[in-house]
Amino acid sequence: IALGAAKTYPLLRQQSVAVGQHFRLESTLRQLAFGIEKDLRRAGFCAGQCAGRPLLIGQAAGEAAGSCVIVAYDITRSGQWLTSGEDAGYFGYRLRNGALEGQRGVSQCDGGGWERLLDHDEVRIERFHVAIERGEHGGALARLTLAGRSASDARIGRNLSGSVEMAALP
């Protein structure tokens, strides 16, 4: 019996580690998607007469179309979409070289100052895509796709997709 247990323990341990890696990847991607969806949901909100574009979908140089999104909303309820400073109302997310990056106060998908949102040694982002469609009732609907893979084990990957109603957009 002891010999049988000794043979099965390494297999059980390996499976347990793999389940843990799947769970960590799933949780990391879901948390990231939740934050992006929150900003997409707020896009276009203004407590006054805001000027500018509330939504920009594009891509960084060398990346796929739709792999960068910049949204504006009136986070301070000042009636403006501030473009710079700690109260900036522009929030950007882009795919670049297998990493998802974010920046506040940004107006274009290229350029510097973007920060990686995840540890590149843990997670590689394979796909980030945002597209806008019309929902059943004619309102704007953002479709978000996010796919990532464990940097330590390429067999562990996860794809997420979801839709977000953007009520403040026409």
Please describe what each predicted stretch is.
Residues W114-P170:
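Short linear sequence signals and composition-biased patches located at protein termini or domain-edge surfaces
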Residues I1, G44, G79-W81:
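Glycine-centered small-residue hotspots that permit tight backbone geometry or close packing
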Residues H22, L32, Q49-Q59, A64, ...:
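Transition segment at domain starts
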Residues P10, R41, T76, G98, ...:
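Residue-level marker of positions within ordered structural domains that often coincide
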